[in-house]
Amino acid sequence: MKLLPEKKNLTVVVNDIRNAVWLEDHTDFNVYILGGLVRRGYHYTTLPTRNEFLGMINIDKGFFSCNGFSVERGITAPDFETAKSVREILDVCCASYLMSDSSKLGTVTFAQIADLGYVNGLIVDTEIEKEDFDSIVAMTDIILAE
């Protein structure tokens, strides 16, 4: 996110309250926050009212994170509500990118968001093992972040 202030004329949609505040403080973007229930301790919204909003928009490029991902089980979240919420956002993205550090590779949590091949790319640190890189690049593009 820290590279975003270099961009101009963006409209950003987030469900994370802290990200919305950071974007408000550091950019001149139009920032929309998806409404709904604030998940206690995690500072993001989920469920009811945002569904209507999501049905009305198209997101050019969506960036999201997860609790774990693997070639076999895909992208996962700690609970069903979070997985469903992220999947609904992905469904309105023209292109979507998973941002994760390599330490989450091989971690599988409770609920699947999507298969790795469902996203257009994985943005990951350079610590990813070559064997893992080769397995994942067969499913989706990989962008190495320094």
Segments (PLM) and residue ranges:
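Active-site catalytic pocket residues across diverse enzymes, especially alpha/beta-hydrolases
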Residues: 3-8, 23, 27
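Short active-site oxyanion
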Residues: 6-12, 119-121
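Conserved phosphate- and dinucleotide-binding cores of soluble alpha/beta proteins
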Residues: 17-146
